[in-house]
Amino acid sequence: MFQNNPLLSQLKQQIRDSKQQVEGIVKGSDKAFGFLECDKKSYFIPPAAMKKVMHGDKIKALIEVVGEKEQAEPDALIEPMLTRFIARVRFNKDKKLQVLVDHPQINQAIGAAQDKSITETLQEGDWVVATLKTHPLRDDRFFFAQIQQFICRAEDELAPWWVTLARHGQSRYPVQGCADYPMIDQHTREDLTALHFITIDAETTLDMDDALYLEPIHQAEEQIGWRLVVAVADPTAYIPLDSQIEQEARQRCFTNYLPGFNIPMLPPELSDERCSLMQDEIRPALVCYIETDLTGNITEKPRFVSAYVQSKAKLAYDHVSDYLENCLDAWQPENPQIAQQIQWLHQFTQARIEWRKQHALLFKEKPDYSFILAENGSVQAIQAQYRRIANQMVEECMILANICAAHYLDEHAKCGIFNTHSGFDKKYLESAHQFLLNQLSDETNQAVLATRYSVANLTTLAGYCQMRHDIELLNSDYLELRLRRFLTFAEFKSEIAPHFGLGLSGYATWTSPIRKYSDMVNHRLIKAVLTQQTCEKPQDDLFVRLQEARRQNRLVERDIADWLYCRYLATQVEQKPTFQAEIQDVMRGGLRVQLLANGAPMFIPASLIHDNKEAIQVNTDTLTLSIQGEVKYKLGDIIQVQLLDVKEETRSIVGTLC
């Protein structure tokens, strides 16, 4: 009687139209209910309604009043949380195939089917890639997924690597090589094999793409400067533009440096052998001559040439640093020529560091954390590694070479792949201005600093560098970390632009063509200038891919590290060890910190900071946490923490204050 009744349908529509409609993101909980997070309000989603949605779904909902409380009734799906996702295989009590999503806030099992292309027999706990096929709000059916790819078995010790690479759509395999690599670049090359080039890398490095030679410049028997010769491996001499290797390199963009092993951008026989600037081997190279005065100022325009070079020594960072620091039983150079190059490079580096300190910006010294792994992938130890003098020697030479390349490309090619950074994000400029005044000004200097840190001044390279130099004098990690939140992201651009992070007017990398596709592109442009050929501007889609690949690689490295940290610290939970930690973030839910001994991330819940949550106030502008009105914790503070719990399934490490 009521079926297909137009009056009833009209009444239902009127009732529906009379209800408030909202859009928001579903937030799950550890209970059956959830919440709909809207711009300015949060609505309760009852358990029955939560069965239609998943944490992270963007939906439209109707707001109903039940008793005296508002609650959300999911109405339409705008954007699902899941499309392609990582999961673990599960079989229910009826032996039906299901998947458990690898996400800390999604715990419901989803029915699944196996794609015919998968040849492995799936077992409980296996890691897989799946896609969501049906969604209750979109398809009027229950959640259902299709397993598209087998990743690895549950017990595979290398799961952190294989799962993370699959999550971000990256290959675990190197690029397929060729049977032979004839040199396609037949242009004339200078013979520079007599110069005493040296390489300085990690002891285990095979893909050596830069070698250095330095000599003093004399006038009337007095030294007036330095002549640095930077030789860079030339893979484009072997790789045709239309080759499969070129296309693979363009897609990968970077060598992926992971804990324990690397996934090279180029075939290993190119990156580790044919192109690598190995000791005593003659190699084609792109070479740059750079002249400076004794204070590090560039005095002549750089000169690029194609050449053949021969590295005379493969040196290791730690050996060279030990030698220069006069460590006990330190390594010694094999001959006077190597010793001379090391000493000259050391002197040159001191001048360049001082030049950058005055005219640009220096990096804040922070350690890198290195995982020491057993053959099966288990973590044996984690070491904090600081940049020593030998690292700085190579770094200063590379930075100088990249400065020269930027201005050379700008002048001669009128294009390139430039590394740029525009400082503060435009939408945060006013906030950065106010923060600086609030933190640094008083009655005596307010007028001066209002001009010094004006929005207009902070948008200029000179004004930004001036501000950073002011901050460095205060030696405040808090100011450094808080201001970092106002910065925009670094970008690749086809035209020269400042790099505020480095404090430079132009920067274009070309010194790592074995490891970076952008450097290969810049090589081709420089070589086009040298051979008087047309310089073709890189296409826009390449810049999009470079940005995405850089972001993906950082996420892959972070996700693997988080997993390994959990495995490493899980064995120590019972001992409840204590650590020094630096506060990295301040949130209403608690503090995020980094353990200084090993770099592990840890979360300190607010409930463990103070037993009365009403006594805790978090200022989201200054990123400080106060207890009963008094600021107790802020970004950059060093605090003592204790390990409480590790949950490998969610890659979370929880601690408390000591």
Swiss-Prot record:
It catalyses: Exonucleolytic cleavage in the 3'- to 5'-direction to yield nucleoside 5'-phosphates. It is found in: Cytoplasm. The keyword Nucleotide-binding does not apply. SMART domains: CSP, RNB. Involved in mRNA degradation. Hydrolyzes single-stranded polyribonucleotides processively in the 3' to 5' direction. Belongs to the RNR ribonuclease family. RNase II subfamily. Its EC number is 3.1.13.1. It comes from Pasteurella multocida (strain Pm70). Keywords: Cytoplasm, Exonuclease, Hydrolase, Nuclease, RNA-binding. Residues 576-658 form the S1 motif domain. Its main location: cytoplasm. This is Exoribonuclease 2. HAMAP family: RNase_II. GO terms for biological process: mRNA catabolic process.
